[in-house]
């Protein structure tokens, strides 16, 4: 990355956290105990893939509202030899799912996925076929060095011993108490005596510890054909869900080639469809490359206006063109072509907000988690995983401690569209586990939770690093903006004068206390050290590893 230099800043802010620097490894997750789990595995001789999987399992315990083995996600891996691979373990629609399985309530922007009785949000009918456990185990088997049973030990211990509830977790429970109270298992676990767990209380998950031990003994087959899978399908059958044993048996992960774009001398690498991030971050960067964004100043009216217009263009194209490539022909080459960006950029008016439609023809919820890990050998993992909404579908499979996803919400409940439901179709996602390379050397890796706000927020972090020349800590904590074509959300640190100027240009501005979730990132410095950073929007914590073994031949003598 460029060394930080003074550039104009209209939106001023102060970082609330400090970065960490190490020489032998870095683990950054959205919970300190999950970061510690990954660091423990690195110190035990594991590589970045081993550590990332250990951190993800630990997050299923410490962040039960965000991620679970009944979820799904994407892992972007850079191997020590420079190869990149994306492991797609996104959830799929059950075999019994149909395009018209929900009753739609609206076609308005921001409300297109609203359904009668929230059936695609809460309850068994909202659950898609899980891919998380199979994906993590596959990553470990292909690219890790340690056995699954060893990698699971930190999470098992955390579930058995329990951990102290943070204010962040307590707030998430409080905000979703009504939905959690509908499920006996979740109510007993998170609402003891009918009240949300409070900060400082201890959360122990004995049933879930037993499930993790079963996985340690049997591998992913414990879910995809074994006892845990039967518990899930029995619950589905009894409660109106669609997942059956055939769905679990037929589930497959996909190994995908990443999308590669370029921006001001950097190669920007991200996941391909069914994720929208790689394609549309490349598209938006191509549009922004035609402007001197850095000279406009961070948080200025012009800079925010251009971000908003680029976002609206990307969302318009995304709605008709980007989905599961097994079901929809995605025009990737066209979308990331710089000539196409030139066409779209030429239509942007600096003094007026526009309503955008797609420039070509066609053929998620805010609660996720992210892990960024690097080892001393050059392996790097940027993994975004989720059960989709806070506490997923707010159902727990009895006797297992497993919390189910509500990934069906990511589909468009209207039939006949690119994102409509079809049996076996992979869910569409905005996950953005991104990496950037300059002159053949990895510069940074980052990601965050936040549903539709994920890839726009990742875009802004990339712009912060490259155009505004922020430090890594500043880039992840900087105030954000977001729009998909309706209202323009501004975090509170964006000045009111800028908000009013944007309103004058036709933007429908609303203030938001937070756009998307806690980003975490690693920068790879020219001297070989690593810098890790996490932001104020979650419990993110970087754990750096330095030092090492004694000098060869050294002995202790008196």
From Swiss-Prot:
It holds the Pfam family G_glu_transpept. The keyword Hydrolase applies. Keywords: Acyltransferase, Antibiotic resistance, Hydrolase, Transferase, Zymogen. The active site is at residue 368. One of its GO terms (biological process) is response to antibiotic. GO terms for molecular function: glutaryl-7-aminocephalosporanic-acid acylase activity; glutathione hydrolase activity; leukotriene C4 gamma-glutamyl transferase activity. It catalyses: (7R)-7-(4-carboxybutanamido)cephalosporanate + H2O = (7R)-7-aminocephalosporanate + glutarate; an N-terminal (5-L-glutamyl)-[peptide] + an alpha-amino acid = 5-L-glutamyl amino acid + an N-terminal L-alpha-aminoacyl-[peptide]; glutathione + H2O = L-cysteinylglycine + L-glutamate; an S-substituted glutathione + H2O = an S-substituted L-cysteinylglycine + L-glutamate. It comes from the Bacteria. Its EC number is 3.5.1.93, 2.3.2.2, 3.4.19.13. InterPro entries: GGT_bact, GGT_CS, GGT_lsub_C, GGT_peptidase, GGT_ssub, Ntn_hydrolases_N. Besides the cephalosporin acylase I activity which converts GL-7ACA into 7-ACA; this enzyme displays some gamma glutamyltranspeptidase activity. Dimer of two non-identical chains processed from the same precursor. Belongs to the gamma-glutamyltransferase family. NCBIfam families: g_glut_trans. This is Acylase ACY 1 proenzyme.
């Amino acid at each position: 990355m460029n060394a930080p230099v003074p550039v104009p800043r209209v939106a001023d802010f102060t970082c609330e956290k400090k970065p960490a620097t190490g020489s032998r490894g870095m683990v950054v997750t959205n919970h300190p105990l999950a970061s510690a789990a990954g660091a423990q595995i690195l110190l035990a001789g594991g590589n970045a893939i081993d550590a990332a999987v250990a951190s993800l399992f630990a997050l299923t315990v410490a962040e039960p509202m965000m991620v679970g083995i009944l979820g799904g996600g994407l892992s972007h891996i850079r191997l020590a030899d420079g190869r990149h691979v994306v492991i797609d373990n996104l959830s799929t629609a059950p075999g019994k799912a149909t395009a018209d399985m929900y009753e739609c309530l609206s076609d308005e922007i921001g409300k297109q996925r609203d359904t009668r009785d929230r059936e695609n949000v809460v309850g068994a009918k909202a659950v898609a076929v899980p891919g998380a456990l199979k994906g993590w185990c596959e990553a470990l088997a292909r690219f890790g060095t340690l056995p699954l049973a060893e990698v699971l030990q930190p999470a098992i211990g955390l579930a058995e011993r329990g951990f102290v509830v943070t204010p962040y977790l307590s707030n998430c429970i409080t905000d979703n108490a009504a939905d959690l109270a509908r499920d006996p298992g979740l109510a007993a676990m998170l609402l003891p005596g009918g009240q949300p767990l409070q900060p400082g209380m201890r959360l122990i998950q004995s049933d879930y510890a037993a499930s993790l031990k079963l996985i340690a003994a049997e591998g992913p087959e414990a879910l995809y054909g074994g006892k845990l899978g039967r518990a899930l399908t029995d619950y589905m059958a009894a409660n109106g869900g669609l997942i059956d044993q055939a769905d679990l048996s037929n589930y497959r992960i996909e190994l995908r080639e990443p999308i590669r774009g370029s921006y001001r001398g950097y190669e920007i690498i991200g996941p391909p469809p069914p994720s929208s991030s790689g394609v549309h971050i490349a598209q938006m960067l191509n549009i922004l490359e035609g402007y001197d964004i850095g000279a406009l100043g961070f948080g200025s009216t012009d800079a925010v206006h251009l971000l908003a217009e680029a976002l609206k263009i990307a969302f318009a194209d995304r709605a008709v063109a980007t989905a599961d490539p097994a079901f929809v022909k995605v025009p990737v080459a066209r979308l990331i072509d710089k000539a196409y960006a030139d066409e779209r950029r030429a239509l942007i008016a600096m003094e007026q907000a526009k309503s955008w439609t797609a420039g070509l023809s066609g053929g998620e919820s805010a609660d996720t988690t992210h892990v960024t890990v690097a080892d001393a050998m050059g392996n790097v993992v940027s993994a975004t995983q989720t059960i989709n909404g806070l506490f997923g579908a707010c159902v727990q499979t009895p006797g297992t401690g497993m919390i189910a996803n509500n990934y069906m919400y990511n589909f468009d409940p209207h039939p006949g569209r690119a994102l409509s439901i079809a049996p076996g179709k992979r869910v569409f996602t905005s996950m953005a586990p991104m990496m950037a390379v300059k002159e053949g050397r990895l510069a940074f890796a980052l990601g965050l939770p936040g549903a539709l706000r994920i890839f726009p927020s990742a875009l802004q972090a990339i712009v912060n690093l490259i155009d505004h020349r922020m430090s890594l800590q500043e880039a992840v904590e900087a105030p954000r903006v977001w729009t998909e074509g309706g209202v323009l959300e501004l975090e509170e640190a964006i000045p009111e004068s800028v908000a009013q100027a944007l309103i004058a240009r036709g933007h429908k501005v609303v203030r938001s206390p937070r756009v998307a979730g806690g980003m975490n990132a690693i920068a790879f410095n020219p001297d070989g050290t690593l810098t890790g950073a996490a932001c104020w929007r979650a419990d993110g914590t970087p754990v750096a590893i330095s030092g090492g073994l004694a000098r060869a031949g050294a002995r202790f003598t008196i």
